[in-house]
Amino acid sequence: VVDGFGRTLAFHRAAKGDVAGAVTGVTDGAGRRFHLALTTQAQRAEAFRKQRASSLSSPASPRSVSSSQVFPDTLPAGTEYGADNGIRLEAVWLTHDPAYPDEQPTAPLARYTYTAGGELRAVYDRSGTQVRGFAYDAEHAGRMVAHHYAGRPESRYRYDDTG
């Protein structure tokens, strides 16, 4: 892709695996390469189960299981716009910068977390600081009810009966 200023963006797609066909890399006009780390709903569910099992083995952790601790292997069926394949962007990594070839970051430029329903929960910067947060209606999948930027007041949304 070439923009109006003559700068190019080249997109790279996964050839195989759980995210085959998805864009997993970008090279910009300056020659910088970025890796887009993608996850599937099943991978996020497995990570959740491992984290939960680890925390349950700790003597200090609570033993009760709430409905918020359920993380399904697949997303709920049916969205208004078609099936959701469950693939989500987990992190963006700078993997090559010609201006600094020996100084690549040891952390992602951005990291993203999701709810059990696949909705974006939080965005983190390269220092690991949460910079955005989102909340959703428990009874209406995907309906955002609040969001906030770090250090700023939360914005909340209310919906009438028609949505």
Q: Where do the language-model regions lie?
A:
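Extended charged/polar low-complexity repeat regions
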Residues: V1-G163
